Structures are given as C-alpha cells and as structure tokens.
Amino acid sequence: MKILIVEDDTLLLQGLILAAQTEGYACDGVSTARAAEHSLESGHYSLMVLDLGLPDEDGLHFLTRIRQKKYTLPVLILTAHDTLNDRITGLDVGADDYLVKPFALEELHARIRALLRRHNNQGESELTVGNLTLNIGRHQAWRDGQELTLTPKEYALLSRLMLKAGSPVHREILYNDIYNWDNEPSTNTLEVHIHNLRDKVGKSRIRTVRGFGYMLVATEES
C-alpha cells in the first residue's frame, strides 16, 4: 500500500515519510502541486496526504482539479487554518478528512487507517488477474485460491504489476517501489525480486519487455 505526501516544508515532509514507512507503508514525498500531479499520473497510490500551503498552487484548487480528473483516492488535508469555513470548503471540494497543524503522529496514523478502511470497504480493495487475486486492504495475495507468502517488496511489485496488467511497467517505476523498502538497493535488487516473484506466481506470468521493464499477463504459457 503506497501513500503520496504533498508538503512544502522539507523537514516536516521527511518526518512524515519516515513515520509512514515506520507504519509499513511505501511512500513518495513531493513539495509542489506540479510534482504531485506528475506522481499521480505515473503511479498508483492508496491515499494522499495534502498540505494546503503549496508554493506553486493553492492546495484546495489542486484538489479540485484532481477530483475533476476522476482521481478517487482518499485525501487527508493538512493545514494550519482551523476555521469552520476552511473545513467546510475542504470537504466540499473533495477532501475526505482534515487534520490541523500541529498534530500528533498517533492521530495522523489513526486517520490514515480509518480512511483506508473506509475506502477499501467500498469494494475497491481486490484485484483479480487470471488465477491471481490480491487484496489491497489486507496485503494478501492468492494463486488458484492458495495464499501466497510474499515479502513486502514482492507484494509491492505484484500489486504494481497487477494494477497495470497487460501493459508494460517501466523498470524505474518498479525500482522506485523497491527503493521505498530498501535504503540502498544494489543494482540487481529488482531482478532478484522479480525472479523470486516469478517462482511464486508462475515464471511465464511476468514477461520481460526488453529495454523497458516488465509486464504481468493473465495466463501462463504452457
């Protein structure tokens, strides 16, 4: 499960990323609306934490735009403003929850868990590709009804490949998923985890797209 954090305060951003990773989430952090939009276009996120005071665009305006583009991920707003009108406006344009600075990390974690539970209970938590099934909310995967034993890195790779099933995923995107779990991955880290994942889901299910990356297909080659 991956979270996007949008916060222009560098120290706070680093602290939020570390806190999210400590809770077991993969995490990307950016400091501008432009970078956040690029991240949404190129990746898949289960939730976004959004500060309203961004340097290049008002956070509420940015949120309005991404909702108009049909991004449905839950959004938790962070802000220093605590007026009733601010909260109402944020919720009206598409925020799912609202947290006022300064805040305790325990409350942030609790709100993230609640938003993810609520979103997953809306029926968006399960993916199926051929004989593979993945439950995003529970971090579980099955092959032919048998639960797979996956490391966090293997789960991150499988979820990315299943979300883009039938389409190639660039190595850099997959490498970044691994990097969220590994501070200093070696150059062959991705290949090692792809090899291990193939052993579990079927060697022919994950195809190498030469010069680009990897692609998950629905059926195994006989």
From Swiss-Prot:
Gene3D superfamilies: 3.40.50.2300, 6.10.250.690, Winged helix-like DNA-binding domain superfamily/Winged helix DNA-binding domain. Residues 2-116 form the Response regulatory domain. Phosphorylated by BasS. GO terms for cellular component: cytosol; protein-DNA complex. The modification 4-aspartylphosphate is found at residue 51. The activity of the BasR protein is controlled at a post-transcriptional level by the PmrD protein, under low Mg(2+) concentration conditions. This is Transcriptional regulatory protein BasR. It comes from Salmonella typhimurium (strain LT2 / SGSC1412 / ATCC 700720). The gene is basR.
